[in-house]
Amino acid sequence: TDKYMHGILNKDWGLLPPKAVLSHLVLMEHPNYPKLLVYGDMAVIPLPEFKQKVAIVKYAAGVCKELGIAQPKIAMIAATEQMLPAMLACTEAAQIAKMSERGQVPGIVDGPLALDVAISPECAKIKKLKSEVAGDADALVFPNIESANVFYKTNTQLMKGVKTAAVVVGAAA
């Protein structure tokens, strides 16, 4: 991975355009989830700033559209689905969800959503959340690299039958 990323980031001959956002997305097939799931960033951006989160949403929507999902449902993951001003993940998720309502980002974006609410219809029902995304997410955007990486490793190391593919997005071809 280090050599691969070094080649992409090389200033003389690399593939990263100026001011571009490079990100890492995973496509996961999970035996306990009814459809493919796209998520990120789990390997490139340690603590995405707001503009980087918007870029990750756009990249995730693009991957979903390539998979034939015309209006991908994208969950902005946080520790809670409550709008807590003290938690940056919550406030930025709410802002990006509002951008989605206005057509400023692709897909149907909702957040903040706790992970259980994003992927479990039962949890969404118990918590009485009215959302097109809750319980039916096509993509998850995590607030930081730690949470995305733990999600990836928990699923790939503790679950049998999980299949993944990863891609670095944002580079020029």
What residues fall within each predicted segment?
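Anion-binding alpha/beta catalytic cores of soluble intermediary-metabolism enzymes, centered on
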Residues: 1-133, 138-143, 147-173
